[in-house]
Amino acid sequence: MRIDGRKNEQIRHVKVTRHYTKYAEGSVYIEVGDTKVLCNVSIEDKVPPFMKGTGSGWITAEYNMLPRSTETRKIRDIARLKIDGRTMEIQRLIGRALRSVVDLKALGEKTLWIDCDVIQADGGTRTTAISGAFIALVDAVNKLHKIKPFKIYPIRSFVAAVSVGIVNEEKILDLCYQEDSKAKVDMNIIMTDEGSFVEVQGTGEESPYTRAELNELLDLGEKGIKQMINVQKESLKMDSLWIGTGGNN
């Protein structure tokens, strides 16, 4: 029996609140168990210097944990005058995950800024940020599409992320913090609704793991991705109909 009574192949309860803030073009407050993340998407009508003149857009992400998102106060990055390595790794991961399902050429020379702020952390903050940010991204892109329809709708597929791991020799899905801190193996999996992998990050925290264990964890992660994408689809409802069509229907 897991700490919160879940089955091994069950993700935590997910609650999504769209249009959470009024200024961002896309804004989602996502709660996965006790992990809570605010995901805002802002649109700029320009691209970074290295993209100028290419006709393509860009998606970049920033990730931040509020000081009391954790059990003890976390010092803000600005107070240290630098971004810590973990933060840099996670925001790059979020950016890569979202770019993987967007046709940047179809987007045009615009930058989509993804801001993910962790309000409360109980494991899986990066996976929660990716899954929530995708919904906010759809809302932001749809705003553009309704004002001036894209020739090719830029979002090609859904993308979501989950964690899996081995705890007490049990393979489990969507680890909370207590489970994560005891994990022999910890892995983050990002996939599309088409079953394609975007990224797999796996670490043997205490000991190496076998190819057979890796395969089992990937299968478990795929089950979790399907659950999370179902949540995304239920949240977006009719606003998800353009995804993957490439057209203006």
Curated annotation (Swiss-Prot):
The reaction(s) this protein catalyses: tRNA(n+1) + phosphate = tRNA(n) + a ribonucleoside 5'-diphosphate
A single MF term (Gene Ontology): 3'-5'-RNA exonuclease activity
Annotated EC: 2.7.7.56
Keywords, ordered alphabetically: Nucleotidyltransferase, RNA-binding, rRNA processing, Transferase, tRNA processing, tRNA-binding
Protein residues bound to phosphate: 86, 124-126
GO biological process, alphabetically ordered: rRNA catabolic process; rRNA processing; tRNA processing
InterPro entries in UniProt: ExoRNase_PH_dom1, ExoRNase_PH_dom2, ExoRNase_PH_dom2_sf, PNPase/RNase_PH_dom_sf, Ribosomal_Su5_D2-typ_SF, RNase_PH, RNase_PH_bac-type, RNase_PH_CS
Subunit structure and binding partners: Homohexameric ring arranged as a trimer of dimers.
NCBIfam families documented for this protein: RNasePH (TIGR01966)
Role summary: Phosphorolytic 3'-5' exoribonuclease that plays an important role in tRNA 3'-end maturation. Removes nucleotide residues following the 3'-CCA terminus of tRNAs; can also add nucleotides to the ends of RNA molecules by using nucleoside diphosphates as substrates, but this may not be physiologically important. Probably plays a role in initiation of 16S rRNA degradation (leading to ribosome degradation) during starvation.
Family per similarity comment: Belongs to the RNase PH family.
Name of protein: Ribonuclease PH
Species this protein is from: Clostridium botulinum (strain Eklund 17B / Type B)
